[in-house]
Amino acid sequence: MGRFIFVSFGLLVVFLSLSGTAADCPPDWSSYEGSCYRVFEQKMNWEDAEKFCTQQQTGGHLVSFQSSEEADFVVSLTSPILRDSFVWTGLSDVWKECSFEWSDGSDLSYKDNYQFVFSEYECVASKTKNNKWRIIPCTKLEYFVCEFQA
């Protein structure tokens, strides 16, 4: 009887530790730290990609990075699929106010040591191999990653 209770308790602990992980994300989406991510192998301009992401899931946007670990996770998703390419991030200055912001409204606390030089270009793409950021024209066609809170 004691062994049965011990095994039952162990199974309960395993079940509870697994709930709240990838199970919160739809099929074809990957889970990390309470968010779901999906790489799309089609190219769009920044505005169309952002709109597409908002239509995929409630609260969806182009990916935003809050830490280097999150950026590394996204690289681990994009690099095997897209090889050496760029993907749109949700970071932009589409209002041309010399103020870059994430499309999901989150704080710009993680910048990957990037020094923002304001120019005629307004949107930020990330390199799939190493997460190096580039400010490029928003009209350029790039792959993209969507994200939403699970």
Swiss-Prot record:
Q: Which domain of life is it from?
A: Eukaryota
Keyword hit for Secreted: yes
In this chain the C-type lectin domain maps to 32-147
**SMART domains xrefs:** CLECT
Keyword Signal: yes or no? yes
Chief location: secreted
Question: Matching InterPro entries, A to Z?
Answer: C-type_lectin-like, C-type_lectin-like/link_sf, C-type_lectin/snaclec_domain, CTDL_fold
| Quaternary structure and interacting proteins, as annotated | Heterodimer of subunits alpha and beta; disulfide-linked.
Q: Per its database record, what is this protein's job? A: This potent antithrombotic agent acts in a calcium-independent manner. Exerts its anticoagulant effect by two distinct mechanisms. It binds to activated thrombin through exosite 1, blocking fibrinogen clotting, platelet activation, factor V activation and other effects, and it interacts with prothrombin (F2), decreasing its proteolytic activation -especially in the presence of factor Va. In vivo, intravenous injection before thrombosis induction causes a significant decrease in thrombus weight.
Family the entry assigns: Belongs to the snaclec family.
Protein name according to UniProt = Snaclec bothrojaracin subunit beta
From which organism does this entry originate?
Bothrops jararaca (Jararaca)
